Amino acid sequence: MDYRRFQSQAQLACYTNERDAIREYDATTPITTNLMGTFKDLDYFEWAKEMDVVSWDNYPGMDTPPSFTAMCHDLMRGIGGNKPFMLMEQTPNQQNWFPFCKVKQPGEVRKLSWQAVAHGADTVRFFQMKQSLGGCERFHGAVIAHDGTEESRVFKETAALGEELDRIGRRIMGSRIESRVAIMFDWQSYWSLEGCVGPTTGFNYPNEVHRFYRALWRRNVPVDMIRQHHASCAAQPV
């Protein structure tokens, strides 16, 4: 536990050093960095205190339940104090690091994008704009693929999504989600439960939290994800 805390705090110190260096020359532009949902190694509630806006990279696997992605969006909203967050990265097509890097189905990226907005995202962004020519990310999806044209299905779908977001999104930017139910997600518990000897080495903390979240998601119940000792948990009856 001591090492886990040290690791998270040390990397946070690296981020704040870089942030402060930028602040010497730019006092107004919001500063953030890419978070990764339920990533184990960093206590994101502590990180969010040092970020002007929370942003994260959403890369669900081919077998990731939509409810788990929804939980991650709500977690990112929760660590930022229920404020709108940024969907910093998603791919308009395939990822390049999964065991099976499937091509997104027609309309899939639209569903994922609006899911993010529905859970509090004020931005929908992509990585990457133009497909890399070298390195492993030459296999990663992009708005503009290796053919360099606007004729691909992916480009046309992404462009249509952009027009849709521009038309509708302006009406809902900055809006807040009101929830009457809260679920605690605590990195200290995450580390201790998965690091202890017994009762099982197969315990997966995010999956256990998701079991409760999924039951609410299936009933269309909005959920706030909160930390231990959350100051405003009295606002939620459950």
Could you tell me what each predicted segment is?
Residues 1, 8-15, 40-53:
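Conserved N-terminal glycine/acidic-rich loop preference
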